[in-house]
UniProtKB/Swiss-Prot annotation:
Family to which this protein belongs: Belongs to the SPATA31 family.
The name this protein goes by in its record: Protein SPATA31F3
InterPro entries: SPATA31F3-like
Organism of derivation: Homo sapiens (Human)
The organism's place on the tree of life at top rank: Eukaryota
Membrane topology designation: Single-pass membrane protein
Phosphoserine modification, residue list: 152
GO cellular component, one term: membrane
Predominant subcellular localization, coarse grouping: membrane
Length: 338
C-alpha cells in the first residue's frame, strides 16, 4: 500500500522546512555582518584621511623650509658672483623699477634692503621707524649713491665701486644718529614738562589749603564769640566744623602722599620743601586744637539762662510783645537736644 512517492514526501517535508529556516537565518546573519562592516569603514577612512592630511602638512612645511633655504643660498651665490664679476646694478634704476612714487615707504624700505645686501650689511630696518622725512633723506642718499655708481662705471674700475658702496654706509649711520638724538631730546622735553606741571599743581594745592584753613578758623572764632547762643547750636557748629575739617584733610592726606612719592621720584630736592610744608601744617593743626580747648573751657549758656531771659522779656513788657508760640516751640525743641 505504501508507495515510494508518499514515503519521500513524508520524509522530505520536514527537511525542506528546517533547511529553509536555516537558510533564512544565514541570510539574516550575513546582512547584519555587512551592515557592521559598512559602519566601520567610514571611521577607518576618516582616520586614514587625517593621517594623510597630517603627513601632507608636515611634508609641505618641510618642503617650504627647504625651498626657502635653497632660494636664500641661490641669492647669496648670485650676489657673490655679481660682486666678484663687478655686475652690480644701479640703485636708482632699482628704485624706479619698484615704484614711481618717491614717497612710498614700502618701496623705500625695499630699496634700502637691496642697498644693504649690495653693501654686505645684515642689519634690518623696520617699517615703523621710517617716516616721510627719513624717506626723503633716504631718496637723497640713493640719488647720491646712484651718481657715485655712474661715475664708477664711467671709470670702469672695481675698486672705485667698492669705495662708493662704502661711502653709502656712513649716510645711514648719520640718519640713525639723528633719529636717536631727536628721540632723546623729545624724552627730556617731556620729562621737564611733566615736572613743571606737577610743580604748578603742587603750588596751587598749597595756595588753596591756606585760605581754606583760615576760613575755617574764622568761622569757628565768630561762632563761639557770639553771646547768647544756645548750647545745642554751639555743639552743632562744632560738629559741622569738625566734619568739614575731616573732609578737607582726608583727600589732602592722600594727595600729599601721592605728591611725595612722585616728586621724590622726579626730583629728590623737593623732599626738603615738602618737610617744611608738613611742619607748617602741623603747627596750624596744633593752633586749632588749642582754640577748641579754650572754647570748651569758656562758660556756656544753659537752659535756665535762656528760660530766665525769655521770662524777663515777657514780664517787663507784656503788652508790647504778643505771645509768640513759634519761638516757644523752637526753644522747647532745642532744650532737650542739649
Amino acid at each position: 500500500m505504501l508507495s515510494p512517492t508518499f514515503v519521500l514526501w513524508d520524509v522530505g517535508y520536514p527537511l525542506y522546512t528546517y533547511g529553509s529556516i536555516c537558510i533564512i537565518a544565514l541570510i539574516i546573519w550575513q546582512v547584519k555582518k555587512s551592515c557592521q562592516k559598512l559602519s566601520l569603514v567610514p571611521n577607518r577612512s576618516c582616520c586614514r584621511c587625517h593621517r594623510r592630511v597630517q603627513q601632507k602638512s608636515g611634508d609641505r612645511t618641510s618642503r617650504a623650509r627647504r625651498t626657502s633655504q635653497e632660494e636664500a643660498e641661490k641669492l647669496w651665490k648670485l650676489l657673490f658672483l655679481m660682486k666678484s664679476q663687478g655686475w652690480l646694478p644701479q640703485e636708482g634704476s632699482v628704485r624706479r623699477i619698484l615704484c614711481a612714487d618717491p614717497c612710498c615707504q614700502i618701496c623705500n624700505v625695499m630699496a634700502l634692503e637691496i642697498k644693504q645686501l649690495l653693501a654686505g650689511e645684515n642689519n634690518q630696518i623696520s617699517l615703523t621707524s621710517l617716516g616721510p622725512s627719513q624717506g626723503s633723506s633716504c631718496l637723497e642718499a640713493l640719488s647720491t649713491s646712484s651718481v657715485s655708481f655712474k661715475h664708477s662705471q664711467d671709470l670702469g674700475s672695481p675698486k672705485s665701486k667698492e669705495l662708493s658702496l662704502a661711502s653709502v654706509t656712513p649716510t645711514l649711520s648719520q640718519l640713525m644718529d639723528q633719529k636717536s638724538l631727536t628721540q632723546s631730546a623729545a624724552r627730556s622735553a617731556g620729562a621737564d614738562s611733566v615736572q613743571d606741571s606737577w610743580a604748578d599743581h603742587f603750588q596751587r594745592g598749597q595756595r588753596s589749603q591756606v585760605p581754606a584753613v583760615s576760613q575755617v578758623m574764622g568761622s569757628l572764632s565768630s561762632n563761639f564769640e557770639k553771646p547768647g547762643i544756645p548750647l545745642s547750636q554751639q555743639e552743632r557748629t562744632k560738629n559741622n566744623s569738625k566734619f568739614v575739617l575731616e573732609n578737607q584733610e582726608a583727600p589732602e592726606v592722600g594727595l600729599d602722599n601721592k605728591m611725595k612719592l612722585f616728586l621724590h621720584w622726579i626730583n629728590p630736592e623737593m623732599k626738603d620743601r615738602r618737610h617744611e610744608e608738613s611742619i607748617l601744617l602741623s603747627k596750624a593743626e596744633t593752633v586749632t586744637q588749642d582754640r577748641t580747648k579754650n572754647i570748651e573751657k569758656s562758660p556756656t549758656v544753659t537752659k535756665d539762662h535762656v528760660w530766665g531771659a525769655t521770662t524777663q522779656k515777657t514780664t517787663e513788657d507784656p503788652e508790647a510783645q504778643p505771645p509768640s508760640t513759634e519761638e516757644e516751640g523752637l526753644i522747647f525743641c532745642d532744650a532737650p537736644s542739649a
